[in-house]
UniProtKB/Swiss-Prot annotation:
GO CC field: chloroplast thylakoid membrane
Predominant localisation class: plastid
One annotated GO biological process: ATP synthesis coupled electron transport
Keyword Cell membrane: no
Keywords, comma-separated and alphabetical: Chloroplast, Membrane, NAD, NADP, Plastid, Plastoquinone, Quinone, Thylakoid, Translocase, Transmembrane, Transmembrane helix
Protein name: NAD(P)H-quinone oxidoreductase chain 4, chloroplastic
Documented EC number(s): 7.1.1.-
Subcellular location(s) per record: Plastid, Chloroplast thylakoid membrane
Annotated family: Belongs to the complex I subunit 4 family.
Membrane association type: Multi-pass membrane protein
GO molecular function: NADH dehydrogenase (ubiquinone) activity; quinone binding
Catalysed reaction equations from the record: a plastoquinone + NADH + (n+1) H(+)(in) = a plastoquinol + NAD(+) + n H(+)(out); a plastoquinone + NADPH + (n+1) H(+)(in) = a plastoquinol + NADP(+) + n H(+)(out)
UniProt KW NAD keyword: yes
Amino acid sequence: MNKFPWLTIIVVLPIFAGSLIFFLPHKGNRVIRWYTICICMLELLLTTYAFCYHFQLDDPLIQLVEDYKWINFFDFRWKLGIDGLSLGPVLLTGFITTLATLAAWPVTRDSRLFHFLMLAMYSGQIGSFSSRDLLLFFIMWELELIPVYLLLSMWGGKKRLYSATKFILYTAGGSIFLLMGVLGVGLYGSNEPTLNFETSVNQSYPVALEIIFYIGFLIAFAVKLPILPLHTWLPDTHGEAHYSTCMLLAGILLKMGAYGLIRINMELLPHAHSIFSPWLMVVGTIQIIYAASTSLGQRNLKKRIAYSSVSHMGFILIGIASITDTGLNGAILQIISHGFIGAALFFLAGTSYDRIRLVYLDEMGGVAIPMPKIFTMFSSFSMASLALPGMSGFVAEVLVFLGIITSQKYLLMPKIAITFVMAIGMILTPIYLLSMSRQIFYGYKLFNTPNSYVFDSGPRELFVSISIFIPVIGIGMYPDFVLSLSVDKVEGILSNYFYR
């Protein structure tokens, strides 16, 4: 067990420091903004230091383990730990949240509550990625929903209450299945109930029971990921939320669903995953085509980007269903890659809206001349999203392709069919992304609204965009840096599978 409680500090610090925001002196919003950004920076530096100096990359086992008794009555423990699978998402969470607080600079209404909710969300997300106890995982999963609901319902567009209610109904409905799965896994098997992750991994279940558990967890994670047909909350939510909230939703929240699928469905329930993986493969393939086609018909800029996120999640689903080292590593790389690209696209869409006050693509046009910096960054991230070689999305999608082709679980004809349909999806992606760029930036200036201030991005916005663009290019040029984190853990997970 680790001597110094690094992970406990990393999980508790944001929400504890965030609660002190309400006691800060009333001297305008500047104090609150700087305080929040300093907390996020401190948290990111602490996380980076702990992982650089106390985490061995060549060790696939759980590290920095902390295990404390919490409730003696039913052996509920505060158990945290990090391995190669959760290391990337935790660092991504710290990075995106820090930039999202910087992006939220223009928020002035109830800014104390706004920044507290962002920090509370930060704690819940890091807790979800690092918990090693199933009930603790569930508590952190739920803790993170409340701030998101409040951020959606209080700051956003005209239909924000509708989209926030839809979000909470979907996610709370999914959480019921998650709780049933957690209690089922915890109560089954040994003489005394245990929610310890390591014990549950080594537990064998009857096939019928394992399938029931698998379906419960799958529904919970399918809402978050999202998987068709449980995706309809996402476009509404993204269309109405403030863009700093969108950065956290697209960058981190969706990735929690993918993380849960790998961590619980693949690692705890390998036999059921082997049975369900062909269905996941089919759904992932349909999702790529369906979301790309639907995105093309969206008038609302943020909804179009939201559907592109749904399409990209299809690649993660296919990578997870391929049950190969290459495919699963590609899915994990896509989790990190899309975390950066999705957050950046929503940030740039939001900053464009701040200037021209228009959300519908057919009302825009000719924005490239007055806003060349925003045009350059938006075009660059669009290229990253359509998997241009040299950027992170390309490596992830190629690895997922190779994962399907090399998979021994599937016959040749299904592999050819899935690869062909995925290729069609990859052709549709540039169509909707480039047409979106054309409608916003090219052509004649269509808007003549009196309240539109067309000036280019300032230093703060440029800093946020470039900070996200550097890792996108870095991972594209040298993907081994991210892959080396998870490659040993992926081998460990897949050692339980017959098909490799």
